[in-house]
Regions:
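Short beta-strand/loop motif that positions the catalytic acidic residue
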Residues: 178-180
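Serine-hydrolase catalytic machinery in alpha/beta-hydrolase-like enzymes
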Residues: 24-122, 222
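Short alpha-helix in the alpha/beta-hydrolase fold that links the catalytic acid
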Residues: 65, 188-198
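Gly/Ala-rich beta-loop-alpha elbow adjacent to hydrolase catalytic centers
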Residues: 133-137, 141
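Alpha/beta-hydrolase fold nucleophile elbow
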Residues: 123-134
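Acidic catalytic loop of the alpha/beta-hydrolase fold
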Residues: 183-187
Length: 247
């Protein structure tokens, strides 16, 4: 009960905190307006991290990650994948929207690429940029590597790791960290085996960390799946990886 009250108070207070520390950035994909967020330390020529949010678009988990990354000395930019007027309002619409970009992966890669350009415009050092993504965004992190986007590393956090097996595996020069919960029903042993095969065939520098007693959205404090201990471990693993490849 006390934990629930404290969590509610924290989440209520973070709205004001986020609004003060993250700046809106409008950008375009043709006629489609996109609305991203960037940390306040822009223009300082620092390593950069692009954050790809979960299937409902920019949320508190992505915002928390951005503010924490700023404390670690990174410029962080949260991408808007869907665009103004297309943000899902429920699980059904989120599933359809995310499903479209998973199927049309080149469109997903393009939206990620446009967000990377905004990150660079806001001061990120071009050859010191990484991508992290949650859930649907974790899929995007892997697509960044598959698409040879100009980033040195990606972190997929409880992402969908599978891809259409009709797609050919290609070379992968991006360093890859996959953080997946052991009890994620959306990821099968076959998905793991296919990903490992893909990474090995691409001669990638990869690692997979699996978190015990954890379900799909184990890193999200708002989710019933939240596992505080494992979420902290996953975040520390993310920071360690980013420090290795960006600092």
């Amino acid at each position: 009960m006390i934990r629930s009250i404290l969590l509610t108070a924290f989440l209520m207070s973070t709205g004001t905190f986020f609004s003060q520390n993250l700046k809106p950035v409008a950008y375009q994909d043709g006629s489609q307006k996109l609305n991203g967020l960037v940390t306040s330390n822009t223009g300082k020529k620092l390593p950069g991290v692009l954050i790809l949010p979960a299937w409902k678009g920019i949320d508190d988990e992505a915002k928390t990650a951005a503010t924490e990354l700023e404390k670690q000395g990174y410029i962080a930019f949260i991408a808007d994948i869907y665009g103004e007027g297309n943000i899902p309002t429920d699980n059904t619409s989120a599933g359809k929207a995310a499903g479209y970009y998973k199927q049309n992966y080149e469109a997903y890669q393009k939206r990620i690429s446009l967000a990377l350009e905004q990150l660079k415009k806001n001061g990120a050092i071009p050859n010191k940029i990484a991508v992290i993504g949650y859930c649907f965004g974790g899929t995007g992190a892997l697509e960044s590597a598959r698409g040879s986007l100009p980033v040195v590393g990606v972190v997929s956090i409880h992402g969908s790791i599978g891809k259409d097996q009709a797609r050919k595996n290609g070379p992968i020069s991006t360093k890859i960290l996959v953080e997946n919960p052991a009890d994620d029903k959306g990821v099968t042993p076959e998905d793991y085996n296919n990903l490992i095969r893909e990474m090995n065939e691409g001669n990638a520098d990869w690692q997979i960390i699996t978190y015990a007693h954890s379900k799909h959205t184990f890193t999200d404090p708002k989710s019933p799946d939240y596992n505080e201990i494992m979420a902290k471990r996953a975040w520390n693993h993310t920071l360690m990886f980013l420090k290795e490849i960006l600092k």
